[in-house]
Design a protein with these regions (language model features):
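Ferredoxin-type iron-sulfur electron-transfer modules and their immediate structural context
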Residues: 1-113
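Beta1-alpha1 glycine-rich phosphate/pyrophosphate-binding loop at the start
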Residues: 28-40, 48-51, 78, 82-86, ...
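Short acidic active-site motifs
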Residues: 187-189
Length: 189
């Protein structure tokens, strides 16, 4: 997917006031806003909008069932076909990885320490948002590899390990501490 393809896909969006695509998104991504910014070729700002609700845009853009969620709710689907929101989302996420755009970070560090059990999509997202809010976060993962079902259950042709690992690296760079091969009740109590 190149920039010209994305601009063409984004141009189909009418940036509806009622935002049915956002309502259809379980994460409540501000879809019309990140697509509006993509149309203006302001991809870094579009990434900032996405990062308010997801730290896994490269991943979700590839594997979410968009046709049942945001795209399935798209107001344009009955006229010109739904806007390909997933493709736009993962393009923006990939641009963030390629250009080294960082996730938002808190300027204020808190004293509290929080443990997150499991480095799957929920655990990593929770850890990232806690860290973004200044908490000291340690993630305990049973296995050697991070990502949970994303790593162990999604085939490589749907989600390549390089994209997944680069996305996880962005989360770790927030200051999240990771401890692998730690099983609750076995290695740690």
């Amino acid at each position: 997917m190149n920039k010209e393809d994305i601009l063409k896909k984004a141009s189909k969006c009418s940036t509806c006031i009622t935002k049915p695509c956002q309502v259809g998104c379980p994460l409540n991504n501000d879809t019309t806003e990140f697509i509006r910014l993509a149309k203006l070729e302001e991809f870094e700002k579009a990434y900032e909008v996405l990062s308010k609700t997801t730290v896994l845009s490269s991943v979700c853009g590839r594997i979410c069932p968009h046709e049942k969620q945001c795209q399935g709710s798209c107001a344009m689907k009955n006229y010109y076909g739904a806007v390909e929101i997933g493709n736009i989302e993962y393009f923006i996420g990939d641009e963030a990885i390629k250009n080294g755009w960082k996730l938002p970070q808190s300027k204020e560090k808190r004293k509290e320490k929080i443990a997150v059990v499991g480095a799957g999509p929920s655990g990593l997202t929770c850890a990232a948002f806690l860290c973004e809010n200044g908490y000291n976060v340690t993630v305990y993962e049973k296995y050697e590899h991070l990502g949970g079902l994303l790593y162990h259950g999604i085939p490589e042709f749907r989600l390549d390990k390089k994209t997944l690992n680069k996305t996880i690296e962005k989360i770790i760079n927030l200051g999240v501490e990771i401890k692998t091969n730690c099983e609750l009740g076995v290695n740690i109590q």
